């Protein structure tokens, strides 16, 4: 997927300058899916080098106090803007997101004091529930260093923060990759199926509780761009693959992002196991009024694909689907697993970015509930309601994105 950033510069008596930055990144598809390339455009309006909202742009154009540099005025940008007060605009995603992807969240926003988003809603958050299928209350040893090279490969490291996923029938692992090396690359990867084990030559990936993510992946990755993740089984023992990042198996995200379910029924939210098998096997089970942290990786320090920043992607299943059913590979007969209707994107890269988007072109199925992003200070609005995505600039069939300017933000299911 190509992710293009367009900066439109305004001036009180200036000339038009349009700068376009191309941030290419691979579209990481799950196994058995064809690679699909798509593009998205992010628009950022700047005045004197600082971002301003679309509302401010349109007001300035209307009263002739602002104009675009070089008179290159984009058409129709103010057509769908509501006359009601709106928070500072975030870059709007204007074309379809591709499915099963890891978006390189990037922007041309320069450092500046965030504009107050007066209409952003403050989230009234209940205490985090412990009913999640992967709740941190069930994790032990999160702060313990992993004993490198000591545990047998037949031992799942649940005493070191990892959460066993017994329903996948992989000995608790979230995914297993049997790899073969050719010089500085891995030239052959065989993905384990139910009943397989973590054995010599395997990279064995694992789930962490909400708010945490795995810290281990080898520096040697797939020769054709495949991602590889987990700890390594070598000579019958489990070994760390990324000890320079952490000697703990699970590390926290940057924090400040949550997911809340107000539906009264279970909802399974599933993170893609990345780097690794790229299947949506990392579960969060939300009960009727649960609030759980949603892990947001730091783009500067977390996994990079060919040097490019990646984000976390979550699949949202229909209500009533359990993590055991929804957080694994589906066959397409039901809108669950990799066929779930909607994805959430979360990442930190020159700002914290949150997205809601259709799992397209895998499916056009609609979710049977709504989602909105609420926060202390958001750059705009983003919600999914009755199968349509809405931002402060109008509606879309593909998705919407906001930046968290300050404070916390929550994806609310309602």
Curated annotation (Swiss-Prot):
Glycosylation sites noted in the Swiss-Prot or TrEMBL record: 80, 377
Keywords: Carbohydrate metabolism, Cell wall, Cell wall biogenesis/degradation, Glycoprotein, Glycosidase, Hydrolase, Polysaccharide degradation, Secreted, Signal
Localisation per UniProt entry: Secreted, Cell wall; Secreted
Major localization class: secreted
GO molecular function, one term: hydrolase activity, acting on glycosyl bonds
Domain of life: Eukaryota
Region of interest: Disordered: 115-141
UniProt key word Metal-binding: no
Gene Ontology biological-process annotations: (1->3)-beta-D-glucan catabolic process; fungal-type cell wall organization; hyphal growth
Temperature dependence: Optimum temperature is 37 degrees Celsius.
Induction summary: Expression was detected 4h after the initiation of spore germination and during mycelial growth.
EC code: 3.2.1.-
Compositionally biased residues, Low complexity: 115-140
pH dependence text: Optimum pH is 5.5.
Keyword Acyltransferase attached: no
CC annotations in GO: cell surface; extracellular region; fungal-type cell wall
Signal sequence coordinates: 1-19
Disruption phenotype: Leads to smaller colonies and swollen and vacuolated hyphae with double cell wall and leaky tips. Also leads to decreased conidiation.
Pfam families listed in its UniProt record: SUN
Enzyme class, broadest EC rank: hydrolase
Protein family: Belongs to the SUN family.
PANTHER family recorded: BETA-GLUCOSIDASE-LIKE PROTEIN NCA3, MITOCHONDRIAL-RELATED, SECRETED BETA-GLUCOSIDASE SIM1-RELATED
Task of the protein: Cell surface beta-glucosidase involved in cell wall biosynthesis and septation, and thus required for normal growth and correct hyphal morphogenesis. Has hydrolytic activity on linear (1->3)-beta-D-glucans such as laminaribiose and other laminarioligosaccharides. Also has a minor transferase activity.
Protein name: Secreted beta-glucosidase sun1
Protein species of origin: Aspergillus fumigatus (strain ATCC MYA-4609 / CBS 101355 / FGSC A1100 / Af293)
Organism classification: Eukaryota, Fungi, Dikarya, Ascomycota, Pezizomycotina
Gene name as annotated: sun1
